[in-house]
Swiss-Prot record:
This enzyme's EC code(s): 2.7.7.1, 2.7.7.18
Cofactor note: Divalent metal cations. Mg(2+) confers the highest activity.
UniProt topology in membrane: Lipid-anchor
Activity control note: Inhibited by P1-(adenosine-5')-P3-(nicotinamide-riboside-5')-triphosphate (Np3AD) and P1-(adenosine-5')-P4-(nicotinamide-riboside-5')-tetraphosphate (Np4AD).
Function of the molecule: Nicotinamide/nicotinate-nucleotide adenylyltransferase that acts as an axon maintenance factor. Axon survival factor required for the maintenance of healthy axons: acts by delaying Wallerian axon degeneration, an evolutionarily conserved process that drives the loss of damaged axons. Catalyzes the formation of NAD(+) from nicotinamide mononucleotide (NMN) and ATP. Can also use the deamidated form; nicotinic acid mononucleotide (NaMN) as substrate but with a lower efficiency. Cannot use triazofurin monophosphate (TrMP) as substrate. Also catalyzes the reverse reaction, i.e.
Gene that produces this protein: NMNAT2
Processing after translation: Degraded in response to injured neurite. Degradation is caused by polyubiquitination by MYCBP2 after recognition by FBXO45. Palmitoylated; palmitoylation is required for membrane association.
Organism of provenance: Pongo abelii (Sumatran orangutan)
InterPro entries: Cyt_trans-like, Euk_NMN_adenylyltrnsfrase, NMNAT_euk, Rossmann-like_a/b/a_fold
Binding residues annotated for ATP, in chain numbering: 24, 271-274
Name of the molecule in the record: Nicotinamide/nicotinic acid mononucleotide adenylyltransferase 2
Pfam families to which the protein is assigned, alphabetical: CTP_transf_like
Subunit description: Monomer.
Keyword Lipoprotein: yes
C-alpha cells in the first residue's frame, strides 16, 4: 500500500486537560505508532481540544490557564497542536460538535470533503497531473511555491491561534478549491482524510453508562468518525464494547492500540497530578512536564484547591 492509498488521519483528543499530563502526550505518540504499524494509516496531525469552562467539573481551572499549559506540553512536538475553538465558544460543546467543527474546518482549508468511516469521500484532493510538472496551484497566491515544511493550516482567522495538521508534501499534492474547473486533461490522485477521536478506555467505558451520552451523538462519533482507544490500567476493551449495542454495531470502527510498551497509564491522570501538587509530592514530575509544573507554580494553580 502506497502513501497515496493509505488513509491520512488527524487524531483529536477532547478533555479537561486539568492539567495536561505526560500521559496525554504519550497517548498521541502510542496511537500514531500503532496506526502506522497497521500499514493502513498515515497520521498527519494531532489536535488537543480543552473543554469549555462551563463544563462545570469541580476544580476545573480557567481555560486561559489550561490552554497555556497544553501549549507548553506540546511545544516540542512537530505534529501535535492545541486548538482553542472549543474554549472560545459561548458554552460547552459536545464531543460530536467538536469533531464536526474540525471536519468542516479541514474541508475549508484543504478544499476537499473529509471522508468518514462508512462513506469515503468521492471528492479528490487534487494532485499533480501524472507525467507533468506544472507550477503548483494554490487558493492563496501568496503561498510560496516551495514551502520548507509540510505543515498546513497555521492560522485560520486571528482568533484561532495555531491549529494543527500536517500537509502531505506539496511536491506530491496541490490543494485547490473542490469546485475548481480544471478541465479534463488532468489525471488526479485521491487521498482519504479522516479525523479520529483519540481517547482512553475510560471514555469508551463511559459510552456504556445509560443516559450519559446522547445516542445520536454516539452514532456519529463511532459510526461516522471512528475512535482510537489507548487502554488504561489493563482495561478489557472487548468486554467494554460488548456492553453497548452501538459499540458492538460499530466495532470495526474502534481501533484499540496494542503495543509492547508497558506504559503506566496512571500517569495520564490529571487528578493524581493535582493531588501530588497539593501534597508537595516530588513524584509530580512523573505526571507533568517541567514547563507545565513551572507554570502551575508561578500561577499558583491547584496548590490550595481540592478535588
Amino acid at each position: 500500500m502506497t502513501e497515496t492509498t493509505k488513509t491520512h488521519v488527524i487524531l483529536l483528543a477532547c478533555g479537561s486537560f486539568n492539567p495536561i499530563t505526560k500521559g496525554h502526550i504519550q497517548m498521541f505518540e502510542r496511537a500514531r505508532d500503532y496506526l502506522h504499524k497497521t500499514g493502513r494509516f498515515i497520521v498527519i496531525g494531532g489536535i488537543v481540544s480543552p473543554v469549555h469552562d462551563s463544563y462545570g467539573k469541580q476544580g476545573l481551572v480557567s481555560s486561559r490557564h489550561r490552554l497555556i499549559m497544553c501549549q507548553l506540553a506540546v511545544q516540542n512536538s512537530d505534529w501535535i497542536r492545541v486548538d482553542p475553538w472549543e474554549c472560545y465558544q459561548d458554552t460547552w460543546q459536545t464531543t460530536c460538535s467538536v469533531l464536526e467543527h474540525h471536519r468542516d474546518l479541514m474541508k475549508r482549508v484543504t478544499g476537499c470533503i473529509l471522508s468518514n468511516v462508512n462513506t469515503p469521500s468521492m471528492t479528490p484532493v487534487i494532485g499533480q497531473p501524472q507525467n507533468e510538472t506544472p507550477q503548483p496551484i494554490y487558493q492563496n497566491s501568496n503561498v510560496p511555491t516551495k514551502p520548507t515544511a509540510a505543515k498546513i493550516l497555521g492560522k485560520v482567522g486571528e482568533s484561532l491561534s495555531r491549529i494543527c495538521c500536517v500537509r502531505p508534501p506539496v511536491e506530491r499534492f496541490t490543494f485547490v478549491d473542490e469546485n475548481a474547473n480544471l478541465g479534463t486533461v488532468m489525471r488526479y490522485e485521491e487521498i482519504e482524510l479522516r479525523i479520529l477521536l483519540l481517547c482512553g478506555s475510560d471514555l469508551l467505558e463511559s459510552f456504556c453508562i445509560p443516559g450519559l451520552w446522547n445516542e445520536a451523538d454516539m452514532e456519529v462519533i463511532v459510526g461516522d468518525f471512528g475512535i482510537v482507544v489507548v487502554p488504561r490500567d489493563a482495561a478489557d476493551t472487548d468486554r467494554i464494547m460488548n456492553h453497548s449495542s452501538i459499540l458492538r454495531k460499530y466495532k470495526n470502527n474502534i481501533m484499540v492500540v496494542k503495543d509492547d510498551i508497558n506504559h503506566p497509564m496512571s500517569v495520564v491522570s490529571s487528578t493524581k497530578s493535582r493531588l501530588a501538587l497539593q501534597h508537595g509530592d516530588g513524584h509530580v514530575v512523573d505526571y507533568l512536564s517541567q514547563p507545565v509544573i513551572d507554570y502551575i507554580l508561578k500561577s499558583q494553580l491547584y496548590i490550595n484547591a481540592s478535588g
